C-alpha cells in the first residue's frame, strides 16, 4: 500500500503500527475519541487470539498508563486462561478526570505468559491538547549493539523510551526490521532482526 511505503520504497512508521495491530495475538483497547483530557473514561480491553496461541494456558494482560511526565497514572492486570474465543473482552479500565488530565497519555498493553512478555502494544492520546508537547517530555538514553543482522536495543535511562526505531541511512529503501517504533521501559532490552548484514 502506498500509505505504508513511500515512493522510493522506504517503509513508513505506520507500517509497524499496523503490523502490531494485526498480529495474530494481541491485546487491544478501544477508544471512541483521541482526546481524553480531564474526562472520566471507561476503556474496554480485549484479547485477540486468532491462532489460539494461549489455548488452555494461563496468561496476564497488563495495562500501564502514563502521563506526559511519564509518571504511572494507573495499572491493571487481567488474569486468564486461554480458551477457544478468538476475541475475548477482558474488562474495562476506568479513569477519572484527574488521571486523564495530561497533555499526553500513553497506554501500554503487555501479554505475559510463563513470566515472559510475548506481546506489547501502545497507544497515545491527548496530543491535540498542546501540539508538539511530545518534544518536551522527559528524555532517556538508548544503547544499541549489533551483531550481523541482530540488533539489541537497551533503555539505559530512568524513563520509558517511546517510538524507539532502527534506521540505516543511505539504505532505508532496503531496510526491513522485525519490529520498529517500540516502547522500552527503563533498563529493558529488545532484540530485533534486520534484513541487512
Task: Describe the function of each predicted region.
Residues 1-179, 184-192:
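Carbohydrate-binding surfaces of carbohydrate-active enzymes
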Residues 195-196:
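Short, charged beta-turn/beta-strand-edge "cap" motif at the junction between a beta-strand
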Amino acid at each position: 500500500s502506498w500509505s505504508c511505503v513511500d515512493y522510493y520504497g522506504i517503509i513508513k512508521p505506520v507500517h509497524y503500527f499496523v503490523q502490531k495491530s494485526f498480529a495474530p495475538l494481541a491485546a487491544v483497547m478501544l477508544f471512541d475519541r483521541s482526546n481524553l483530557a480531564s474526562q472520566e473514561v471507561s476503556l474496554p480491553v480485549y484479547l485477540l487470539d486468532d491462532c489460539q496461541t494461549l489455548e488452555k494456558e494461563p496468561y496476564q494482560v497488563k495495562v500501564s498508563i502514563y502521563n506526559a511526565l511519564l509518571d504511572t497514572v494507573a495499572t491493571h492486570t487481567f488474569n486468564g486462561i486461554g480458551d477457544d474465543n478468538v476475541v475475548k473482552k477482558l474488562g474495562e479500565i476506568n479513569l477519572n478526570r484527574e488521571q486523564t488530565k495530561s497533555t499526553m497519555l500513553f497506554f501500554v498493553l503487555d501479554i505475559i505468559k510463563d513470566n515472559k512478555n510475548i506481546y506489547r502494544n501502545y497507544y497515545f492520546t491527548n496530543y491535540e491538547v498542546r501540539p508538539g508537547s511530545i518534544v518536551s517530555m522527559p528524555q532517556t538514553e538508548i544503547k544499541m549493539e549489533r551483531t550481523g543482522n541482530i540488533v539489541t536495543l537497551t533503555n539505559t535511562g530512568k524513563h520509558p523510551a517511546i517510538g524507539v526505531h532502527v534506521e540505516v541511512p543511505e539504505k532505508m529503501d532496503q531496510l526491513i526490521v522485525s519490529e520498529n517504533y517500540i516502547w522500552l521501559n527503563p533498563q529493558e532490552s529488545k532484540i530485533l532482526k534486520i534484513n541487512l548484514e
